[in-house]
Amino acid sequence: MKARIIVLLASLLCANAYAQNGYSASTAQSSGQNDTVYSTNQVGKPATNGGKVYSTTQVQPPDPVTDAVRKRFQLRFQDLKIGVVRPTPYGLFEVQLGGDMFYTDKDVSWVMKGPLIDAATRRDVTRENLEKLSAVSFSELPLDLAIKQVKGQGKHRIAIFEDPNCGYCKQLRHTLKEMDDVTIYTFLYPILSPDSTVKARDVLCAADPGKVLDAWMLEGKPPAPAHCRAPIEELVALGEKLRVRGTPTLFFEDNTRAAGVLPPAQLRERLTRNVSQ
């Protein structure tokens, strides 16, 4: 058996580790190469269980050892809401806390935060598992809240959460501009600043929201002031429920998601794959 090296990034675990702003760059695996995926992070509150459930992930009952790990973890961190707990092939136990993944031993004598990298395959195991746990049924997304734009026949569908002031979202817009045969559903998610809320309202209240959004994101032409009953609160609540922790966040028809700007080739592959499967 090939030896495998597990790379762990240590992190302090605190009770209120769900409030931070800023920019981040994380590494994703694609076709055997490392692609840098950029996103603007805004960590929201953990999703509640109220309302419609969008996750398609089914959790199996834990075995006695895993159940004991959960109980020990909860005993040591009584103020945290624990999600999925399960063993890994690497001799560790994976513990989901909101949108983060932590690792511990069977005695919960130490806790470390991912990402966990499989050195043999160079896969980001943490990212893969979080994507599975955060799977969202595309057909259940409330697309009536989104700005719909059809390019070509619109065969490929994608839903995107964007902040109007997100630089990486603008970069993604330029990538999508070069693509055809795609239907884009944009959920405006104003989380970066009060001005983001104003711009989101102005876009949503415009006569042609898609045209105004592109003018701002692609050309830097700010939307004209507009007033209406824009569903800002509903959009923010939706993003929190779906654990959208940064912009842009992309949702595909195969119920997977991606955080950040994907390289053009990888984005095309994801769109094509979703239709063929």
UniProtKB/Swiss-Prot annotation:
Signal sequence region: 1-19
Name of the molecule in the record: Probable thiol:disulfide interchange protein DsbC
Disulfide bond sites: 166-169, 205-228
Protein's cellular compartments: Periplasm
Keyword tRNA-binding appears in the UniProt entry: no
Organism: Bordetella avium (strain 197N)
Gene3D superfamilies membership: Disulphide bond isomerase, DsbC/G, N-terminal, Glutaredoxin
Keyword line: Disulfide bond, Periplasm, Redox-active center, Signal
One GO CC term on file: periplasmic space
Purpose: Required for disulfide bond formation in some periplasmic proteins. Acts by transferring its disulfide bond to other proteins and is reduced in the process.
Pfam families associated with the record: DsbC_N, Thioredoxin_2
UniProt family annotation: Belongs to the thioredoxin family. DsbC subfamily.
Alphabetical list of InterPro entries matching this protein: DiS-bond_Isoase_DsbC/G, DiS-bond_isomerase_DsbC/G_N, DiS-bond_isomerase_DsbC/G_N_sf, Thiol:disulfide_interchange, Thioredoxin-like_fold, Thioredoxin-like_sf, Thioredoxin_CS
